[in-house]
């Protein structure tokens, strides 16, 4: 029987002093106290040990350990002592008498403690007066790390503020049995136990990377006990079906100390196989030595294609319409970053969530309260897990309303708020604040300074593509392809999997007849077959069966989807469970329920029809997918006399199609998930261009084909001074390439970073924002929703003007330009009869989208909530961009993606008083950042509504190109030679060698 914890009931015999307000003197105890009952950083031993803390006396003999990495020289006052949050071995189970703890520690204990701290990449912090240990911090150049408030942070753990974690379980089962295996500390266990992810922590300094810690979820998922896990390598999960090639990749990753994310077939203790999405992340010290590995597992058997991943259609394209592995890897990579941060800084979790752990009621009552704060902002969530809840898993959905009972699925696939859940779009008075930026938690989120936060910042600035509109339709439906034998399923929604209990691997490539059973009416089935043969739609009710044999009444609607020629591409099958509305006597669904259900499934089918048209036809050949990239690009009217076009025209006049051989690599400009951008020179000229090269295989595997095709189509439409021109596009055997303008000024993001305070003055913000407004106006007029406005995508031209770039996340729809006649009051009519009223030009994209794309910090609320979005998302992003130019950071940024999304939906907009800004610019940003898109500036009259705001007073919109750029503290071109020594890009040379 596993022992249980027994909290101590013996009260303390000594009373701690209190200050003038009656608060406990915790941080400054009286000098009369020789020592506290529970010394700082000395947690009580777990109840399962039933012995005193041996570290209160001379240290016990320990087995010889591997040498720890060398540490920088510390000051004399930084005395190394063993702290409670290091990886410690089990003390020998013998009775040890308690002795008075003094400041003096044996040298061996000090050396051992410092070694253990070094293995975690940490340093010990001591009190400058007494030399007593005061905490452990991340190693930095200064050698110490203090609390932002100038105080030494302390934390004390007792039996009252924690519960039994999986780490305690694992350690309890091996009491000293594996003395050679270091165990994670109590504080680290406490931090890790707050996460709901399934993961293990392995020791990279030991041979074979033994497991030091396993979460409770790992034991539940695999069926193994802690005694069978701790101290072993994870290979016990492997079996006959585990891919050897994938295992070789994992071994190479571990040897190199790199990250890994992949799906492998593993086996539980009872022999059951399951698909495991494994993400490995290394924990390194400041010298780059790998100390630990975190291995996060997610069982994805329900949603993955599994063995069907490599299944191909006769045309060579994947059998599945969507590649789900790419979706799952994106979410897993983001989720594991939280675990990495917890292992690197175990205390950071409790410090960030429990801002005032020792505050008494009397103290909290005296704190000034903000009248405009929301109730949700006044509550600091607990960082420790308790019976009532816990830290939110980053892969769970965001909910503004109380959550319903979670589904049994092991993976919440979307990881976001469902469309069906209500979103409070009202703007209350507390949404905007003009006070001091004194929220410590917010300040930590908004201004990260540590190395880890900088890594997180780099990740959060990348564009994300989490789901297409099709994937976000949360109804029970499948899509089949009648052009293939037996009309197989090529797409199944997550909701359909939940309803039928089948996994995606089990149904892809199969006909829907597997839902039939003993009581399924064959006459009704014949109606469906006739509709398929005749390519017509039909709506029926029939009994179907789940995988477990449970029957349900299905209101089923079949609808063909036709292409522009009128030929059937797909069949859409929508199911609705009507079992709750069955009349017991007649054993049929109630008539009113049937009518409502039929209307719902038909409406859903229409939405699916529109959504699936965003994707390329699955019956295309791979050559057809990239055919547009081989077309000749024709010159646009406003660019025909420019030097770049004249140079391109000379090549075209020779009759030879432009290809990779016409360009010479100069240097790389950047890289992303699907490709890279290079500076190239047209051979035989001095004309420079930017070439974007995208890997075809990566585009297919990451569901990016339709994005790349849309970007090529969008670039071919553009003819505007604040947007790039497309000069050529071509393909090689492995890549597709786009040739566009090169802008020597670089990114607005880097321009901001070069400024002394990382911000721009208000006149500069006005200049760049005005040009962005004009560029967005043109895009919207062309029916383009940009969807990825951020400083990285605002490039600076040679003359100082801006140009938007990167349209792979943009949406191309239709647009209907309108002329709006302003309404005039009757009293003013007579006065204005002589002057003709100027009509307002408005052109906004007509069709809404619901795909989950954008950049984390710039995504609008309606994208997160799944309510569907229009071009209003670009005006939201403009508000975020202006805020970042003014203050140097975005207003809703969080330490995790989930926190950022929560902030976007809930957090108040605040303008810090540390940087002066006019009322006009604050009002403009506030109106652009309305959570309800119907109330957002630009919704009614488009760009004209934004132009008319008082912040832009004095802007001559017709002659905006003639406006001189503002003077900056650090100029755009700082005198460095633009055409310096040219560096040949090996990657592009290799690409050139493999030209088609």
Curated annotation (Swiss-Prot):
ATP binds at residues 669-677, 692. Residues 60-70 have a biased composition (Pro residues). Autophosphorylation is inhibited by staurosporine, but not by tyrphostin 9, sphingosine, GW5074 and BML-265. Belongs to the protein kinase superfamily. AGC Ser/Thr protein kinase family. FMN 2 binds at residues 511, 513, 516, 529, 544, 554, 556, 575. The activation loop within the kinase domain is the target of phosphorylation. The PAS (PER-ARNT-SIM) domains are required for the binding of FMN chromophores. It is found in: Cell membrane; Cytoplasm. Gene3D superfamilies: PAS domain, Phosphorylase Kinase, domain 1, Transferase(Phosphotransferase) domain 1. The gene is PHOT1. Residues 434-443 have a biased composition (Acidic residues). The keyword ATP-binding applies. Present in guard cells (at protein level). PROSITE patterns: PAC (PS50113), PAS (PS50112), PROTEIN_KINASE_ATP (PS00107), PROTEIN_KINASE_DOM (PS50011), PROTEIN_KINASE_ST (PS00108). Residues 1-184, 351-413, 434-453 are annotated as: Disordered. Residues 444-453 have a biased composition (Basic and acidic residues). The modification S-4a-FMN cysteine is found at residues 234, 512. InterPro entries: Kinase-like_dom_sf, PAC, PAS, PAS-assoc_C, PAS-like_dom_sf, Prot_kinase_dom, Protein_kinase_ATP_BS, Ser/Thr_kinase_AS. Its EC number is 2.7.11.1. Keywords: ATP-binding, Cell membrane, Chromophore, Cytoplasm, Disulfide bond, Flavoprotein, FMN, Kinase, Membrane, Nucleotide-binding, Phosphoprotein, Photoreceptor protein, Receptor, Repeat, Sensory transduction, Serine/threonine-protein kinase, Transferase. Undergoes a photocycle characterized by fluorescence and absorption changes induced by blue light. Half-time of photoproduct formation is 14 seconds and 70 seconds for dark regeneration. This is Phototropin-1. Homodimer; disulfide-linked. Interacts with PKS1, PKS2, RPT2, RPT3, PHOT2 and BLUS1. Subunit of a complex made of CAR6, PHOT1 and RPT3/NPH3. Associates with CBC1 and CBC2. Binds to BHP. GO terms for cellular component: cell surface; cytoplasm; cytoplasmic side of plasma membrane; plant-type vacuole. It comes from Arabidopsis thaliana (Mouse-ear cress). Protein kinase that acts as a blue light (BL) photoreceptor in a signal-transduction pathway for photo-induced movements. Triggers the phosphorylation of AHA1 and AHA2 C-terminal penultimate Thr in guard cells to activate them and induce stomatal opening in response to blue light (BL). Also phosphorylates BLUS1, a kinase involved in stomatal opening. Mediates the phosphorylation of CBC1 in stomata, but not of CBC2, in response to blue light. Required for blue light mediated mRNA destabilization. Mediates calcium spiking of extracellular origin in response to a low rate of blue light. One of its GO terms (biological process) is response to blue light. Binds 2 FMN per subunit. It is a peripheral membrane protein.
